[in-house]
Amino acid sequence: MAIDEDKQKAISLAIKQIDKVFGKGALVRLGDKQVEKIDAISTGSLGLDLALGIGGVPKGRIIEIYGPESSGKTTLSLHIIAECQKNGGVCAFIDAEHALDVYYAKRLGVDTENLLVSQPSTGEEALEILETITRSGGIDLVVVDSVAALTPKAEIDGDMGDQHVGLQARLMSHALRKITGVLHKMNTTLIFINQIRMKIGMMGYGSPETTTGGNALKFYASVRIDIRRIASLKQNEQHIGNRAKAKVVKNKVAPPFREAEFDIMFGEGISKEGEIIDYGVKLDIVDKSGAWLSYQDKKLGQGRENAKALLKEDKALADEITLKIKESIGSNEEIMPLPDEPLEEME
């Protein structure tokens, strides 16, 4: 429908005035501007990249990764850092918990020599550092570990029994209001790692769990990922890792509520080879005959762990199978679910 000529002139004049005050591009017609594809940073997990709908976590947005203790939150975040660095990105890790394991980060592929690290004393200090490095325009990804450890200065300076109701929530709300627009402008991704707490006096319907830091992060986050440990992985009666499930509970860039399962191996992180086997079998790309797994005419190994070991050594073969999986899933509207039962016994 055609717009009235007088209205067109009035709007054009207003746009010129706005551009003069706030800079060119402050107000544009969508028809005059090409819609850009949302870029993403891989999570290091094939299944989670697919579940997120765009191949990873979106750039220039706020991401929240939360779950119980030892569920894989920091491991997943370190994998995202490693993937970002592989593509030439500059990353920062704000270690509010003062618990970053540098040697473990190296094992996951993080370039620790070029990783910017801060261990702030207070929540205010952490968020000031976050704002400063983001406004610099030279950073691609910042991880804050964790929201629960962003302790306000008033609480640190006060006595042990003092009450500081809502102080951390107000701190987070203020920081997010300031930083959200800057993140978009600088195309910087911000990941908050968060913990869960039980709601006091929770009765009736609804989840008894909540995350720390108030409600602001729930609103400002474009993506929220709930990660949980669902099983232990054993080999020869020895615990070698955990099976984790990640659910995308909020997604502003693709359909939400998709899930992914993957192995987190002790000392190694997310097993990409395990996901290749799981999706390969589900999509009939990898053949499973009894305990034996094979791809085309090549035997991958007897048992899942042996097949994983072979794919870990043969990167070219792993990449070839991964490509076939992506091509197969890409032809479908829905993400292919993982097998209903794991390929090897877990507990």
From Swiss-Prot:
UniProt key word ATP-binding: yes
Family matches, as Gene3D superfamilies: P-loop containing nucleotide triphosphate hydrolases
Cellular component terms (Gene Ontology): cytosol
Primary site of residence: cytoplasm
GO molecular function, one term: ATP binding
Pfam family, one: RecA
Gene Ontology biological-process annotations: DNA recombination; DNA repair; SOS response
Keywords, alphabetical: ATP-binding, Cytoplasm, DNA damage, DNA recombination, DNA repair, DNA-binding, Nucleotide-binding, SOS response
InterPro entries in alphabetical order: AAA+_ATPase, DNA_recomb/repair_RecA, DNA_recomb/repair_RecA_CS, P-loop_NTPase, RecA-like_C, RecA-like_N, RecA_ATP-bd, RecA_C_sf
CDD domains tied to this protein: RecA (cd00983)
Domain of life: Bacteria
Binding site for ATP: 67-74
UniProt keyword Nucleotide-binding, yes or no: yes
PROSITE patterns referenced in this protein's UniProt entry, alphabetically: RECA_1, RECA_2, RECA_3
Locations listed in the record: Cytoplasm
Purpose of the protein: Can catalyze the hydrolysis of ATP in the presence of single-stranded DNA, the ATP-dependent uptake of single-stranded DNA by duplex DNA, and the ATP-dependent hybridization of homologous single-stranded DNAs. It interacts with LexA causing its activation and leading to its autocatalytic cleavage.
Family, per entry: Belongs to the RecA family.
Protein name: Protein RecA
Gene: recA
